[in-house]
Structures are given as C-alpha cells and as structure tokens.
Amino acid sequence: MGIEAADFDKYDVVYVSNAEEHQYLDSYVPKKQIGTKALSSVLVSLADSGNGLKVSTYNINYCTAGMYKNALATAGVEDANVIVAGPFPLSGTAALVGTFEAYEKLTGKELDESVVDAAMDELVTTGDLEQSIDGDSNDVEAMIADLKGQIASGKIKTPEEMEQAIEKLADKYDLKLSDDDKQKLLGLMKKLQGLDLNWDSIKNQASAWAVSYTHLRAHETAAN
C-alpha cells in the first residue's frame, strides 16, 4: 500500500487480532483457513457522497474485490475507497474485520453486530460458491448483488419468490448451482431480509454492479 511504519502517525491505525478474526469467522470458516496470525492489511479512506465503494486487492487469494464490496455494502459501508493487501498471498479475512473497525472509527458510526455477522456470512457463502461452481467469480458476485437488489426493491419477498429468483439468476449468469448451493443462498437471503439494513445503499450497489458487469462482459466480447 506504499505506507511505511514511520508514516503511521499520519493515519488512524486500527489493529485486528487473530482472536477477533476467530470471533467473527469461526461460525463460517474452518479454523485452519483463518490461521493463527492476522497478516492482511487494509487502507480505508472516505469518498465523497455518491462515489460508492471502490475496492482493490493485492496478494489476497481467497477474498476477491467483489466479495469485499458485496459484504461491505451489506454491513452499511458506503462511499469509501478500500485497499486490501498482504505481504504474500493469503486469505484476507483479517482485512474484512479491520475494514469494519476502521470505517467505524472514521465515521463515528457503530455497525450493528448482527449486520456485521451477516456480512461475514455473505463473504464466506460467496467464497464457498466460487470454489464449488465451475464458473467465473464475477458471475457469482453479480448474481448475489442482483439478488440483494431485488430484495431491496421489493421484487421478491417470500422464500418461494427467493427460490424462483435464484433459479432465474443462475440461468442469467450461466451458473450451475447444486441443491446445496441454492439452499445456502436462500438461507443467506432470508437472513439479510430479516435485518435492518441500509436497503437504499444495497439497491444502489446492485445497480453499480449491473453496470460494471455489463462493461466487463462487453470488454471480454470485444477482446475475443
């Protein structure tokens, strides 16, 4: 990230322990994957209102920029620039915890624990899907953003409507979901629906995802 230890006094520095990683993630991630040390780092800066979330990663091999973006939006983080980095390839789970704590310190807004827990669940569910599905991570992340956007806009409300939406979006994004994958998604969406989230922000993020996804696919088509 280009920041030397001597420059730390220019920043608000938050340290995340490995114990905090386990506190947030043990319910969703095998302890072996979390490890015994918190090594990833994150730089968070606030952006002007309406700029949305921008995330970039370096040396992070489990969490993608899209995974962070979706989870952060769920937790209520908005209008921020986030850089996540590791000294060598690593999972990046500590950085997500650090991002939440840094955002709270920067804004003075305390994030609801149940919402943060749901964001962690979303991150891990997304990662599990990306590992189990023979597909592009962008497709999985766009589908989840799309699902959340439909809940935010009131297009889907009941579990039955969620199941139908999952089926339709799997086709839209050309993803082959197993029954277990579908149940994980359904469980996550039901959890999110039951929380007091910033649904306007989630709806805006879903729209931004749709635009970036369209540009990505158009670029790939042009390259081919």
Which positions does each model-derived feature cover?
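N-terminal Sec/ER secretory leader and immediately downstream segment
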Residues: 1-77
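Soluble oligomerization/assembly scaffold segments of membrane-associated complexes
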Residues: 73-175
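Catalytic-core signal marking the mid-to-C-terminal active-site face
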Residues: 155-213
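Conserved small/polar residues in nucleotide/adenosyl-binding loops
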Residues: 214-221
